[in-house]
Every structure is written in C-alpha cells, then in structure tokens.
C-alpha cells in the first residue's frame, strides 16, 4: 500500500541519521520520514538523503534542504532559501519588519523543476518531463506547491512594502555535455544530485496523491535517470542583458543600499547563439569566476527586494 506508514518502535534502524531518534522517524514505502507535523514535509530524511545534501558545497540548492528555511539575522540583513509558496506571505511581512531601514534587503533563491530544451533534444513527452509534471501536480494537490510563479512572488513582496524588486534568472546545465570545462563540471555535479533525487522527491507525493505504487515510482525514476544521463540532450540559451550599461548589474540602482552578496554582469551584451558567459564576483574576497550558460537547463530564480527610503516612508505612514 502507498500509505503503510507506521512510527518505528524498536531500535534505531539502519539509514536513519545519527542525530535522529526512533521517535522522530517513521517508515513509509521503504524510506524514513520525519514525524514533526507528519505528512507535511513529504521527502525522506534518511541517511541517503542527507548524503546527497552534502553536495551543497557546490552552491547548488540541494533537493533535501530546498524545502527547509534557514535564517541569518546579521546587520539587519535576512538571508533565506525555501519554497516560499508553502510558507505564505506572512513570512515576507515578518522579514520586512525585521530589516534595518535604508539598508536591509532580502534575497530568495529557488529552482524551477520544469526541464527545458530549445532544440527538441529533451522530448516533451519524455520521462524527465513526465516526472517533473507529475511531481508538481501532486504537490499542488496537497497545497504544497513547488511550481514557481515569479509574478506572484513579486506581488507578495510588493504587498508587504518592498520596492525595487529585481529578478535574475540563472540557467543551469542538466548534465555534463558542454565543451567548456567549468560548465561541464557544473553539469556533472548537478546531474549527480538530480539523478539521486528522482526517487526520494517523488515517492511520497506520487504514491499519496496520484495512486502510484512504489514500484511504478521506481520505474519512472529509473527511466528519468537514463534520460538525463545521456549527453545527447543538448540545448542553447540567450542570457538576457541587463538594462544598465556594461559592468555591474546593480541590485538597487536607485538607492544607496549596499550589496554584499554576489553580483553578476553580462560578459557580452550580444552573446553568440548557444553560449554566453556570466562572471560572478564574490563579495567577500573579490574572486571572479565564469559560468557559461549553455545546455539543457533547470532554472534558478533569484529575487532580491530592498527596503528603500520610499518603502520605509510608506511603512511609517501605514503605522
């Protein structure tokens, strides 16, 4: 059965992270899940999932930690990553309330799990697209959407008082086919994480919401793995140039709010078809690296919103 879950009552089982006790986990379809608000977080927390999360050092939002919220309250800044539609707009209001006036800003990072390819090498009726669509549909049915809606996010930020909201879309290779060394390595690492995530991400949602059996989910995940493993899946992109002159793409062009996080600028305002380069400067030490945006992509969307003097004035008037 898809919902044969029972809390574990014996010794701590194999595969459970060492910092977990048996009261904190329950078994369902061969994986271990957390009992806190049981059923809300539908992804496993067993050892294999946390092993995959260790790949976060390559600066790709990991699938296990993607739905968790991390806060850093430092110098009036808030840094967080999560699936915000699950949490609701009240969190935006709390973030806004705690930001330092005239200085604080908020940055949100998401992965768009809709795979895409412009040259048709990724079949729209293929297994990867089927997996992504079924997963997003299932999560929608539970009221826990992972489908991105940039316009809704911007509107919610504006509703609580943020202005100068800027969205940056970074395209990410799904596998290691690119010829450029750095981009190929990036694609290989992301490919490793994605292939390990197909089954755990979709097991509970598809079994609970779509009536799939564990065997059917395993079969779909295996076919999706085979599809993304092939470097014959190729595509291209044209990375949009910014409205500002060549150089840094200012996060808040009409204010004096500093931007200590990473900044990006377009290496060429008219990139050649099929490839373009984005240089990134680390705000801590000034090191630069180049990421070529080519290939079959998942899309990371980063939205930055600032508290400007105008926004603070609106907040004071409302108070």
UniProtKB/Swiss-Prot annotation:
Disruption phenotype: Abolishes the production of chaetoglobosin A. Increases the expression of velB. Leads to reduced amounts of spores. GO terms for molecular function: methyltransferase activity. It comes from the Eukaryota. Keywords: Methyltransferase, Nucleus, S-adenosyl-L-methionine, Sporulation, Transcription, Transcription regulation, Transferase, Virulence. Its main location: nucleus. GO terms for biological process: methylation; sporulation resulting in formation of a cellular spore. Methyltransferase; component of the velvet transcription factor complex that acts as a global regulator for secondary metabolite gene expression. Controls the expression of the chaetoglobosin A biosynthesis cluster via the cheR transcription factor and the subsequent production of chaetoglobosin A. Positively regulates the expression of smtA and negatively regulates the expression of velB. LaeA also regulates pigmentation and spores production. This is Protein-methionine methyltransferase laeA. It comes from Chaetomium globosum (strain ATCC 6205 / CBS 148.51 / DSM 1962 / NBRC 6347 / NRRL 1970). The gene is laeA.
